[in-house]
């Protein structure tokens, strides 16, 4: 479970972080 959760957490954060940063950067 730790492994799966860790990967999921890292993958989820990576996608959200990139989109988030890209969304405001493009709007600005």
UniProtKB/Swiss-Prot annotation:
Keyword terms: Allergen, IgE-binding protein
GO MF entries: IgE binding
Region entry Disordered, spans: 1-28
Protein's recorded name: Seed allergenic protein 1
The organism's place on the tree of life at top rank: Eukaryota
């Amino acid at each position: 479970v730790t492994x799966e959760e860790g990967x999921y957490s890292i993958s989820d954060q990576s996608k959200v972080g990139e989109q988030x940063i890209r969304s405001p950067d493009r709007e600005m």
